[in-house]
């Protein structure tokens, strides 16, 4: 968790701060697996670092591949709300050419080739493929844009006075990108179309990698995890992109497939966290994970979709902390919630538009969830055992 690692921003080389940490891929390397990174796994400034190792950790891999496609060389063709900037603002391009010419297409090709090599050599492997899309700029071949006619796209709306129902820090999180507030509907539809196109393009590249698993026969004894590093707003709550504590930004996709699983094709309702991936993969592969890990294994859910390894998912951003249970999202801002709270009931408000935290009828629920959240905050702030930390100013930029 950020309060354990003290890393609360991007653009950091992990060894500068945690020099003796054992990363997940290192665990596999130390147990005889050949570990390869393709594309964006650690932080990258996008698209600036495409074709480089970004803020990668070289100790984590036996081999790395840094694909660079025509999306990088065609940057001058990209539309951007902020001319000259691409990654931190809304930007897109309906590109010419084929999937295989794009950076992520090149990554998928490399992954497929590597899988064929491992199948031939019968070597155990850990392969991490990080696709850049749908990170801005939303670049995908034109055919993917054509799948989503703009006239059919509905732009999310926000009721008048909505911001006043939120604590000040939550309001500020929705207003931080000034040039993206109150976008015209047509521009919004263009952005949504481009986002959908880039997701579908990325999905096609995942499909190519999975096809290679099937074709090589590796699928029968390979664990596959599909996920992302954060969720996204596309106009919901009047906001675009990431970094809020709403479901849109805090929730990520998670699909796990493993040999011998009996709950295949089922959805698990229990909450899960990203810190759970490491212990889960360790258990599935019969390895011993470091004792310092804060996560829990999700392995039991692969055979029992009703299993509940944890009861809430914990998220931290800025001065805010949030938990998500089966029914509720509860968020507090500032120390002990002094800057306000939010409560959303997903049974009646899956869009999280009605803050119930200050309603008397919900006082008991707020008190109960606040207690759980404080316990989670305390646990998430305990320094990890056996991990050396080098303190530094988190505002310092690492280029």
Predicted regions and their residues:
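Active-site segment of extracytoplasmic enzymes that catalyze sulfate/phosphate-ester chemistry
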Residues: 1-22, 27-37, 47
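A short beta-strand-to-alpha-helix junction
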Residues: 12-22, 100-101, 164-165, 192-201, ...
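Short beta-strand segments
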Residues: 39, 126-133, 223-228, 255-256, ...
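Active-site regions of oxyanion-processing enzymes, predominantly non-cytosolic
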Residues: 45-69, 102-162, 214-223, 364, ...
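C-terminal cap/loop subdomain of S1 sulfatases and analogous C-terminal strand-loop tails that border
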Residues: 54-55, 60-71, 100, 118, ...
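Short glycine/proline-rich turn/loop motifs
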Residues: 86-98, 172-193, 258-261, 348-353
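A long, amphipathic alpha-helix that forms part
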Residues: 105-119, 180-222, 376
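Histidine-centered active-site microenvironments of extracellular/periplasmic hydrolases
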Residues: 137-143, 212-266, 273, 310
């Amino acid at each position: 968790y950020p309060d354990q690692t003290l890393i609360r921003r991007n653009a950091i080389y992990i060894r500068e701060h945690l020099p003796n940490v054992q990363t997940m891929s290192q665990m596999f390397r130390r147990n005889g697996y050949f570990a390869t990174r393709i594309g964006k796994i650690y932080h990258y400034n996008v698209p600036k670092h495409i074709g480089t190792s970004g803020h990668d950790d070289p100790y984590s891999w036996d081999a790395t591949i840094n694909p660079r496609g025509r999306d990088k060389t065609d940057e001058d063709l990209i539309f951007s709300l902020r001319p000259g900037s691409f990654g931190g603002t809304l930007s897109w391009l309906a590109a010419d050419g084929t999937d295989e010419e794009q950076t992520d297409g090149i990554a998928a090709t490399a992954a497929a080739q590597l899988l064929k090599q491992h199948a031939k050599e019968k070597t155990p492997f850990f392969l991490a493929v990080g696709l850049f899309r749908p990170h801005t700029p939303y670049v995908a071949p034109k055919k993917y844009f054509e799948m989503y006619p703009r006239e059919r796209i509905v732009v999310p709306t926000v009721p008048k006075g909505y911001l006043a129902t939120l604590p000040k820090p939550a309001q500020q999180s929705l207003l931080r990108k000034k040039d993206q507030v109150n976008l015209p509907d047509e521009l919004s539809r263009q952005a949504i179309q481009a986002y959908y196109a880039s997701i579908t393009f990325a999905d096609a590249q995942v499909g190519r990698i999975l096809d290679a698993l099937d074709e090589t026969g590796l699928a029968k004894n390979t664990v596959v995890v599909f996920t992302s590093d954060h969720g996204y707003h596309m106009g919901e709550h009047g906001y675009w992109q990431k970094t809020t504590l709403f479901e849109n930004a805090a929730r990520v996709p998670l699909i796990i497939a493993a040999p011998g699983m009996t709950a295949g094709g089922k959805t698990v309702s229990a909450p899960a966290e990203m810190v759970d991936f490491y212990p889960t993969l360790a258990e599935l592969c019969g390895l011993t994970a470091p004792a310092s890990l804060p996560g829990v294994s999700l392995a039991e859910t692969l055979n029992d979709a009703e299993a509940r390894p944890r009861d809430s998912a914990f998220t931290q951003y800025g001065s805010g902390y949030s938990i998500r249970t089966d029914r509720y999202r509860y968020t507090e801002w500032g120390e002990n919630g002094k800057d306000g709270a939010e409560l959303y009931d997903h049974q009646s408000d899956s869009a999280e538009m009605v803050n119930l935290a200050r309603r008397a009828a919900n006082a008991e629920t707020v008190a109960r969830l606040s207690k759980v959240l404080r316990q989670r905050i305390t646990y998430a702030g305990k320094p990890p055992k056996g991990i050396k930390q080098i303190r530094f100013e988190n505002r310092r930029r690492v280029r």
